[in-house]
Amino acid sequence: MAAQVSHTVLRLEAEDVRNLKDGINFQKNNKDGKCYIIYKANGELRACRNQCKHQGGLFIKDIEDMDGRTVRCTKHYWKLNVATMQYVNPPDSFMQDELEAVLSETDGSLELLELNPPDPWTAEPREAQDLQAGEITLTYITHACMELKAGERRMMFDPWLTGPAFARGWWLLHEPPKDAMDRLMEADLVYISHMHSDHLSYPTLQHLSKKRPDIPIYVGNTSRPVFWYLEKSGVNLTNINVVPFGVWQNVDDHLRFMILMDGVHPEMDTCLIVEYKGHMILNTVDCTRPNNGRLPHGVDVMMSDFAGGASGFPMTFHGGKYTESWKANFIKNERKKLLNYKAQLVKSLQPKIYCPFAGYFTEAHPSDRYIKETNTKNSPAELNELIRKSCLNTLTWTPLPGSVLDLAVALNNRSNETAITDPPHGTKIYKDNWEFDLYLNQLNASISAEIFKHKHWIQYYYNWAGFRNYNLVIRVIETDDDFQPLNGGFDYLVDFLDLSFPTERPEREHAYEEIKNRVNVMRHVVVNGLLWDDLYIGFNNRMSRDPDVYHHKFWNHFQTELPLSAPDWQHFLQICSQTQENGSSNGCSVS
């Protein structure tokens, strides 16, 4: 069975991209004659093959369309709204399979990408067999961590059981069951969806490695390796399996699983299909467009994120339009859109059981009270209520730590209250102790690192990072926990056009961002060569920008494309030592 790959089906050069009009654009690949539709609105692009899902007819402009969103099939006059990729005539029929539209920031070209094969789970199909009560159970542990028991096997998803995520910004909302760590130790295999620290939790894996260093852990073959930081972390795990996308991995005669990529973040995000005796469980985790939007219909169980708020935007921004009322209105609208999107996705896929998870975190540290109060999140109960209104045959599950879903019982009678067992009365549900000092002391240890006695660490670090030839200037200011400038802290400019470090902003026209970073997190990131997710997703900075533009190329580089090996700070200190011996009083000079 060949691995699933992403390939380009149509490429438009920059001039052709600029010529795309708002609304519907019909395009043809002159090399193979295949036809496509590109819909443009508000600078956003959506695309699909020009082929009706009913019987393969070609779409043309719909003369009855008044808003420029609908095309009509020449065969049986079916109509497709390309703004939503939903067929509107007949209603409630199909969703069009969407292509990923990728704009190049280098040359302005556009590529339409398609996964091949698009639905690999259909390979080697298995008929669903009857299940006995207790044969398949799902136990919710906390956040994105579930334990799947299938026959004699136990599989754990994304174990984050202790410690913070994103340096110090995220903490567990739910108290894991008392035996959660024991369950992890006894698992037959572990799936970790991606490298973010609320899924790949090194504090958790440190505990695991002491007793089970050889436990089989499975990850997808992402371009940025999930365990890129393993050696530096000091965690000893010896049985990490990187598997190709879209290929069944057989655990035993009845149990198998398949890892799929995300359409928006294929470099890091993955999702999972597990099948036992022909019964499928779909876990989309954090994927924005899991498997590029093409997913199996009618699975037995579907799980997905739901909460929102997994980003510093807009809470950590200030100046300009970023008033408290603007932030509150934006957050309210974004959460509502996410809620409706998840409900629509469930409606389109029609799983037998749906569970919202992977959103149970809190900004627990007292210094992040503002974030906690501002960063409101969706309610899983509200999402499930919305789903029940449109999916009458879907059982919804709002999990609590230790609650158990028995799949066989649920499938036999979805109204059977015994299908879901909640934790005993009096069980502690929410955490109230996170051992802040233990983990913040680890961050604080970086503040006094030897490299920060030499101001040229800045030049050395950004040369290591390797981002340049981009007309952006940033000012980075080290602060205390409350984002007040730190006495004796570094305050510097970086000009990424030529990767220089001026004392004043250049006179030429340029984009500008001012970034205030908590000193313990920033220095921890610098010393260890970590990604800037700890700063941005962890709410550990405050930002303003002029103009108010998101610089994707810059943030994508510092969040996903930094070198896999940390800066060689020993080499840096050797240079500094040699420079001092030569009589320099500046510390060092790094070319």
Swiss-Prot record:
The yes or no answer to whether the keyword Acetylation is present is no
Describe the location of the Rieske domain by residue ranges.
12-110
Q: Which SUPFAM superfamilies match?
A: ISP domain (SSF50022), Metallo-hydrolase/oxidoreductase (SSF56281)
Q: What class of enzyme is it?
A: oxidoreductase
Cofactor(s) this protein cannot do without: [2Fe-2S] cluster
Q: Which InterPro entries match?
A: CMP-Neu5Ac_hydroxylase_Rieske, Cnh, RibonucZ/Hydroxyglut_hydro, Rieske_2Fe-2S, Rieske_2Fe-2S_sf
Manner of cofactor binding, per the entry note? Binds 1 [2Fe-2S] cluster per subunit.
Q: Which residues form a coiled coil?
A: none
GO biological process terms held by the UniProt record = CMP-N-acetylneuraminate metabolic process; N-acetylneuraminate metabolic process
Q: Report the pathway entry.
A: Amino-sugar metabolism; N-acetylneuraminate metabolism
**Catalytic activity annotation:** CMP-N-acetyl-beta-neuraminate + 2 Fe(II)-[cytochrome b5] + O2 + 2 H(+) = CMP-N-glycoloyl-beta-neuraminate + 2 Fe(III)-[cytochrome b5] + H2O
Tell me one GO molecular function of this protein.
metal ion binding
Q: Give an example GO cellular component term for this record.
A: cytoplasm
Q: Record-annotated residues binding [2Fe-2S] cluster?
A: 52, 54, 73, 76
Which keywords accompany this UniProt record? 2Fe-2S, Cytoplasm, Electron transport, Iron, Iron-sulfur, Metal-binding, Oxidoreductase, Transport
Q: What is its EC number?
A: 1.14.18.2
Where is it located? Cytoplasm
Under the heading PROSITE patterns, the entry gives: RIESKE
Q: Which CDD domains match?
A: Rieske_CMP_Neu5Ac_hydrolase_N
Q: What does this protein do?
A: Sialic acids are components of carbohydrate chains of glycoconjugates and are involved in cell-cell recognition and cell-pathogen interactions. Catalyzes the conversion of CMP-N-acetylneuraminic acid (CMP-Neu5Ac) into its hydroxylated derivative CMP-N-glycolylneuraminic acid (CMP-Neu5Gc), a sialic acid abundantly expressed at the surface of many cells.
Family of this protein: Belongs to the CMP-Neu5Ac hydroxylase family.
Q: Which PANTHER family match?
A: CYTIDINE MONOPHOSPHATE-N-ACETYLNEURAMINIC ACID HYDROXYLASE (PTHR46522), INACTIVE CYTIDINE MONOPHOSPHATE-N-ACETYLNEURAMINIC ACID HYDROXYLASE (PTHR46522:SF1)
Protein name from the UniProt record: Cytidine monophosphate-N-acetylneuraminic acid hydroxylase
User: What is the native source organism of this protein?
Assistant: Danio rerio
